Design a protein with these regions (language model features):
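Short alpha-helical donor nucleotide-sugar binding micro-motif in glycosyltransferases
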Residues: 330-335
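A charged, aromatic-enriched C-terminal amphipathic alpha-helix characteristic of glycosyltransferases
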Residues: 400-437, 443-446
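Conserved acidic donor-binding segment of nucleotide-sugar-dependent glycosyltransferases
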Residues: 374, 378-385, 394-399
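Conserved donor-binding/catalytic core segment of Leloir-type glycosyltransferases
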Residues: 225-246, 252-255, 268-270
Length: 466
């Protein structure tokens, strides 16, 4: 008798054979195209999808000196550098000449995507997933939807538009965007903001590269603390724009309060070029804190350590050199607290990177959905420096709790890799594709097994015919 068994492994409606991805964004992976977290998101998400085996096309405002089209990752990832003829007159990055680029983007991109990617893929029986990022792509996404409608192809494409922040929300035609795309965002905090606008976006979190889960060299961690001559004191770190929203004043005021307690403390501060930095450092001096600039033109770990050692006498070290990811991870791991808090944070990637390094993240209480107070970090609810002070005193008095928090932080970060984010995205795309009836449900795979008794009978029967 034949035994029938159904396979219960997870079955995907969206597969690498039946789906093509298109990502539309102003920012991208070129240094010319990077202006913030959006370019990093687009680069990491597209690479994660391509690594999974999906064909991926990325359209962005690329470096005018690089090829207009570049094929990567074994042909699975294609970079399309758009508006290069305009960018050559605007050498200062992606947002230099933004309005001119935006006009050309809206006029030329939708037709190209529909004619050269979407329509051919749909003709082959494939689903097309088109993902737009930030306000600059809203008009283009709506036009893509309209062009697909005109060709009778709209139900074979899933269009998601994602809000990473609230920048230029006033420039978006929300009625049209909501009709032509499925709106998404990166955290429940952003979802709640958009609820107030009559929108109900899907939440698809950001991620971090899986490589950031690798352990940080403890020898480098010890070396950093030795360079700071901290002698059992408290190291705080903050990496953010010089922006009032990032609560820099709270950071320097917490250092002053720790000093008043008789605790030795140092703040490693890496800001940007914004003028608010002058105000923050002036406030630090008013509080009686010493400030030093750490500078180096060399780009290696030894020079970074040396630069910090030269400033170790200061209470606040203003880091004036670029911090590559490998050195950032050492700072995150070596610090007693990484102040990743702000008054408005759509997601909070610094807090998650800190967790991945085994650091102690002090996040805000806005978009950092991954943070659980006293479990994998600390969640600051106010702008009062006494809150930071209190948590640091707690960690000093209960060092075992700090160790537990660091361990849980690493476990949490493992759930927020770009691979996990891509998997989440695919699940949401599948749901929408089913609503559009763009996916045909397949029956579970059936496997037949032959029992030993049946096999013996079959062999006997075969032998009798020989």
């Amino acid at each position: 008798m034949l035994a029938r068994r159904e396979e219960h492994t997870k079955t995907r409606g969206i597969t690498t054979e039946n789906t093509v991805f298109v990502i539309v964004s102003f920012e991208g992976k070129d240094p010319y195209s990077l202006a913030g977290g959006l370019g990093v998101r687009v680069a990491n998400l597209s690479e994660a999808l391509a690594d999974m085996g999906f064909p991926v096309h990325v359209f962005f405002i690329g470096d005018p000196k690089l090829p207009g089209e570049e094929v990567c990752q074994g042909g699975r990832l294609v970079l399309h550098r758009w508006c290069q003829w305009i960018s050559q007159y605007h050498p200062n990055g992606v947002y230099d000449g933004e309005e001119s680029k935006l006009r050309d983007f809206n006029q030329s991109l939708p037709t190209y995507i529909v004619e050269h990617i979407a329509a051919p893929a749909i003709a082959q029986g494939k689903l097309v997933a088109i993902l737009g990022e930030e306000w600059q792509t809203t008009e283009a996404m709506s036009r893509i939807s309209d062009l697909l409608h005109q060709r009778g192809l709209r139900d074979k494409a899933v269009l998601f538009w994602n809000a990473n922040n609230i920048f230029s929300f006033n420039r978006i035609d929300w009625g049209k965007l909501n009709r032509t795309t499925t709106v998404t965002t990166v955290s429940r905090y952003m979802k709640h903001i958009m609820w107030g606008m009559g929108l109900n976006p899907l939440v698809i979190p950001n991620g971090i590269p899986k490589r950031l889960l690798q352990p940080v060299e403890e020898e480098k961690v010890r070396q950093l603390r030795q360079c700071l001559s901290i002698d059992g004191g408290t190291v705080l770190a903050k990496v953010a724009r010089w922006d009032p929203d990032k609560r820099w004043h709270m950071a320097v005021e917490s250092v002053a309060r720790l000093k008043q307690r008789g605790m030795k403390a140092v703040l490693l501060a890496r800001g940007g070029m914004e003028p608010h930095g002058v105000e923050v450092l002036s406030r630090a001096r008013e509080l009686g804190l010493s400030v030093s600039e750490a500078k180096t033109s060399d780009k290696n770990l030894d020079s970074y350590f040396h630069a910090l050692q030269n400033s170790c006498w200061a209470d606040v070290i203003d880091i004036k050199f670029h911090l590559p990811q490998d050195f950032l991870r050492i700072i995150y791991r070596a610090s007693d607290a990484v102040l990743a808090n702000s008054g408005h944070e759509p997601f909070g990637i610094v807090g998650l990177e800190t967790m991945a390094a085994g650091g102690v993240a002090f996040t805000g209480s806005t978009g950092e959905d991954y943070a659980i107070p006293y479990h994998n970090g600390f969640v600051l609810e106010t702008s009062d420096p006494r809150e930071i002070e209190g948590y640091l005193v707690y960690l000093r008095e209960c060092p075992d709790e700090g160790t537990k928090i660091r361990n849980e932080a690493k476990r949490t970060a493992a759930y927020f890799t770009w691979e996990a984010a891509a998997d989440n995205l695919i699940s949401k795309l599948e749901s929408q594709a089913r609503l559009q009836r763009a996916l045909v449900k397949r029956s579970p795979a059936v496997r037949f097994e032959i029992t030993e008794a049946t096999e013996s009978k079959l062999l006997q029967t075969a032998g009798s015919h020989n």
